[in-house]
């Protein structure tokens, strides 16, 4: 088995230090406009690793890909359709399968490391 523990601090440190570009308003926002910034760290076809940051507010999602996230800073409540809410914050990970539907209520500007696959 490969030891990957050394990669986690590297990825988190790189993600926190990444210069983010303006990615415009969040299309999934369901209230006031929410601003997003981000940086793609690696991409190959439909697979992508990057950093995403978004200002507070409510949004609704229908995911077209699988997504794994590691929260670097900020807080949000994730509520799948028909399921209970889950609060996530710094150091938490979450996996959203393709087709996942639900809401994200971002309470504090969130920065996440994401993997699309």
Give the ranges of each region predicted by the language model.
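A short, N-terminal "cap"/entry segment at the start of jelly-roll beta-barrel domains
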Residues: 1-46
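Conserved short histidine dyad/triad with adjacent acidic residue
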Residues: 43-63, 97-98
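Conserved hydrophobic/aromatic beta-strand scaffold that supports enzyme active sites
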Residues: 49-51, 68, 93
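Short, conserved beta-strand element in jelly-roll/cupin
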Residues: 54, 63-78
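Short hydrophobic/aromatic-rich beta-strand segments that constitute the beta-sheet cores
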Residues: 61, 78, 112-114
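Short acidic-glycine-tyrosine-enriched beta hairpin
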Residues: 82-98
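Ligand-binding loop in jelly-roll beta-barrel domains
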Residues: 98-117
């Amino acid at each position: 088995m490969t030891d990957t523990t050394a990669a986690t601090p590297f990825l988190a440190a790189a993600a926190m230090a990444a210069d983010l570009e303006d990615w415009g308003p969040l299309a999934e926002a369901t209230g006031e406009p929410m601003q997003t910034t981000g940086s793609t760290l690696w991409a190959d076809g439909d697979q992508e690793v990057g950093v995403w940051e978004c200002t507070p507010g409510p949004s609704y999602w229908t995911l077209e890909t699988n997504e794994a996230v590691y929260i670097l800073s900020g807080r949000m409540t994730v509520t799948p359709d028909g399921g209970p809410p889950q609060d996530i914050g710094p150091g938490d990970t979450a996996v959203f399968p393709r087709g996942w539907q639900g809401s994200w209520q971002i309470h504090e500007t969130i920065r996440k490391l994401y993997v699309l696959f």
